Amino acid sequence: YTFRAKGSGKSGLISVSHCGQEVLSRSACEITDKEITARFFIGFPANGRTINATELEKILFDFLPVCIEKAFFYKNTDHRNLEQAIFLAEDQDSIRSQLTKKNLVAFVADHSVLPRESGISSRPLKDSVPFMSPQSLRVSMELPHEGTIYGMGIPAGITLIVGGGYHGKSTLLNALELGVYNHIAGDGREYVITDANALKLRSEDGRFIRNVDISLFINDLPNKKDTRCFSTEDASGSTSQAAGIVEGIEAGSKVFLLDEDTSATNFMVRDTFMQEVISREKEPITPFLERARDLYEKAGISTILVAGSSGAFFHIADTVIQMDSYHPVDISTKVRALCGKYPLTEQKAPAFSMPQSHRILSKKLPGIRSHGRGAGKPERLKIKVHGKDGFLLGHENVDLRCIEQIVDTEQTAALGLILKYALENLVDGQRTVSEIVQLLSKELQKKGLAAFADGSSLPCGYAVPRIQEIYSCFNRYRG
């Protein structure tokens, strides 16, 4: 249904959230047992700077009721499509609930379409090779509506994804990292389901870090800086990745997803030659290779890692999946046999202990308005969203470009809203980041995003982020 009102600019424009491939909880629509609440934008018809009341009356009382009737009245919906959408969501949730029971961290159904149309499109690639699970990793899932489906189950532990260039390693990992969300019918990844708290990690040169215990990975810095409470305005790749893992542990993630291509090499592994040239006493970094096993056995955190250059990870992997011309092959048995032929020089890592970060979130005092009716009063915090890349809160830029599981600008907008609320209501110089996020999580579960809205109403244009992304946002706020 389209309508164009008389007037200048966006007169008569009626718009609502533009949904993508992922299913997100959005402020655009809320359904309870008693009511449906829809939120949308209307461009008031105007002549210059004056609202055209006659045209506005037509929008509100003639055209808008037609839109509402077509969109929300059950008699006007495609009953079959509506039913299938509900059934699909229930089946997807069923798979996710079965992962832990089956000791899995992810599931990829047979016949899934993993490649995307392009780097700027999340639609499925036409004529791509459908996913088919290797027999040794094939599991079944009993779903309430679809019945029994089969696919590849990725077990808890350390999983290595290997293969030649362009054979589909990163494509599989990308599908798994977005498997924390349900997907719409026709996406191709409807039954690619990952543990809901799984976290994609990468290096972030130049990121801000405050009071993070990175001693699990980095110690004995030449400048004598205490790595149990480490801060920097300009982190290196290895330091940023170490901080990201520690922050992920704090956020409750039990599955880490990493790609060698976007990781700091010196953080991930040190080969035998380098160990001979630079002794352990001269190297402050304990590589991830030496910590991954402890993370699983002592903290219950699984790892899914894409690797293509270093064979050292074969020695710690529980499961090894080779992508061969877009087909997964379980080569775990072959790898175990070869590990004896190519032994790994053992380096004794420092004793494992869980990080103990105690980070207090701080805030700057707002500036004072210098002119206008509010002269002499504190400036209001304003949010300016920069797509999925981040937002400006007041004068502080929050850079979220490396948070790869943010899939929608509306999630970024919601993160800005939540951070603003926290700074104005919860940050007191005493509470830790973890305590603040826990309080926010309770409010989110109780009232939804409306708990953080300015005034009494929540507008359209917000989508609920995961707790992991809330932590990531707060950890990147320089304050």
Regions found by a protein language model. Give the residues of each.
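N-terminal accessory targeting/assembly segments
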Residues: Y1-N103, L114
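Flexible beta-alpha connector loops of hexameric P-loop NTPases
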Residues: N52, R207, S215-S238, R270-I285
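Carboxylate/His-rich catalytic cores and anion/metal-binding grooves
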Residues: K102-L104, D110, Y166, L173-E204, ...
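N-terminal pre-Walker A segment at the start of P-loop NTPase domains
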Residues: P115-Y150, A185, I193-A198, R202-I209, ...
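Glycine-rich phosphate-binding P-loop
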Residues: I149-Y181
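Phosphate-binding/switch loop-helix module in NTP-utilizing enzymes
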Residues: R228-S263
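Conserved P-loop NTPase nucleotide-binding/switch module
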Residues: I249-A292, Y296-E297, S309-A337
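Conserved NTP phosphate-binding and transfer environment spanning the P-loop NTPase/kinase superfamily
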Residues: E297-G300, V306-G479
